[in-house]
Amino acid sequence: MAGATGGNVPSLADLQQYAVNRSGAAEAVRQTLYDWQLYPTAGINQLSFFQNPIGQGVTSTNGAVAGSAKTKSDTNMTLSGQLPNPQAFLVESIEVFFLAGSTATANTYAVFNPAQVIPVGTQILADQELDQVSVLNCGYLDFFIGSKSYLTESPLFSFPGKTGISVESAFATNSATTDALFTVNARSVGRPYYLDPKISLMATQNFNITLNWPVAIPTPSGFNGRIGIKLDGILFRNSQ
């Protein structure tokens, strides 16, 4: 049957392929597994991801009560280091994110405002953007499943995010008496890190991803950051 725009209208049989109510059947949906943590301003040698599910660990969400447990803003893991039965996940790509912060209070993250004022007659460096450069410019990622590693890669900017907030503007002045306002932002760029072949995580299979640095890398800004990992792929689960 032709539609108003000349396309073909799916039949009821075709529509059934996308039904969410199919008793006894499985379904596959596009989804990410994600986990965020606080990056302390003093730096750290290793961070382990996907080990603290919702309700455990420490949140790194902007504005959250310091030291409170993780919520869905931090992770969508419901078990520690594994998927519940009967779920499975096909990992297609890996992304690593770093968000600069604006507080050094323990167990607290506060978002960084990229707009800054340059005082008259001075030149300043955007230390928060150097945070990302310092942290992601070294170190390595290790994807460990079962009893062995399936991926080791360095440096960490090898895993750019597919999405992000871009702030692109500049302002210059030659005035000796007027302050200037500028904005600056930075993020990893390049092709996404696709796994070839893809990797399947079956129900109750233990796994973790660690970010590792040979020495603790402090943030030049003196503030805590927020660092996260996304596994992009297909989630397999029972239909309803």
Regions found by a protein language model. Give the residues of each.
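Beta-strand-centric surfaces of beta-sandwich/beta-rich domains
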Residues: 1-240
